[in-house]
Amino acid sequence: MFKVVICDDERIIREGLKQIIPWGDYHFNTIYTAKDGVEALSLIQQHQPELVITDIRMPRKNGVDLLNDIAHLDCNVIILSSYDDFEYMKAGIQHHVLDYLLKPVDHAQLEVILGRLVRTLLEQQSQNGRSLAPCHDAFQPLLKVEYDDYYVNQIVDQIKQSYQTKVTVSDLIQHIDVSESYAMRTFKDHVGITIVDYLNRYRILQSLQLLDRHYKHYEIADKVGFSEYKMFSYHFKKYLQMSPSDYCKQAK
């Protein structure tokens, strides 16, 4: 759904952010990387990402110059720096930067920022009447990054790891030392929906990314864990109030 450009002259940092952060959980399905501001500017102009994460001190074109070049674009920016100095703070204030992160990057802190950002992006899409607006309410329960219950968080993690398989509730809770009835009741109390409902909503959410990649619909159904295409189609219509084909037409 959303796109991000990660710009840093240190390969270990940009590739680390690309690989370690669970971008799909925050609805970012396309991640681009650049080693300097020149590469980043080209990617930004070409792909129009919703988020840019950039270092400040880089060769060829630094982060401040990059901010100047993209000031007219509608994208969010997170600044990375090894220096807690006024130069990049001033640049960030001038360009309405979303947040600042000092290296080494605290991944948990970045995920908190992403959680806030995705809520804003989805709300904007809903207000603008864009194609994702109908699914905003359906996917609202999936937006919370962490719950205040250990078992609920474990179940959510298991869903995200195994949704592509023909997984059952028993499979999802087999690694936690509680009964199935307790797990189901606790999950519903904290999340507001059942485990099975969460699983199916998450599968449909992931399917939207594959619809954008021109897979056949029966292939998508299998890739996101539905045993039959008709079950995929049923849940798609249930949550989005339209068929996969109609969604694709509306998204064009």
Swiss-Prot record:
InterPro entries to which the protein is assigned, alphabetical: CheY-like_superfamily, Homeodomain-like_sf, HptR, HTH_AraC, Sig_transdc_resp-reg_receiver
Location of this chain's protein in the cell: Cytoplasm
Single GO BP term: phosphorelay signal transduction system
Response regulatory domain residues: 3-118
Cell inner membrane recorded as keyword: no
Keywords, alphabetical: Cytoplasm, DNA-binding, Phosphoprotein, Transcription, Transcription regulation, Two-component regulatory system
SUPFAM superfamilies for the chain: CheY-like, Homeodomain-like
GO terms of molecular function: DNA-binding transcription factor activity; sequence-specific DNA binding
SMART domains hit by this protein: HTH_ARAC, REC
Record's comment on post-translational modification: Phosphorylated by HptS.
Major subcellular site: cytoplasm
Entry GO CC: cytoplasm
Pfam families found in the cross-reference section: HTH_18, Response_reg
DNA-binding segment(s): 170-191, 217-240
Spans traversing the lipid bilayer: none
Origin: domain of life: Bacteria
4-aspartylphosphate sites (modified residues): D55
Span of domain HTH araC/xylS-type: 153-250
Function text: Member of the two-component regulatory system HptS/HptR that regulates genes involved in hexose phosphate transport system in response to changes in extracellular phosphate sources. Activates uhpT expression to facilitate glucose-6-phosphate/G6P utilization by directly binding to its promoter. Antagonizes CcpA-dependent transcription of a subset of CcpA-regulated genes involved in antibiotic susceptibility.
Protein name in UniProt: Transcriptional regulatory protein HptR
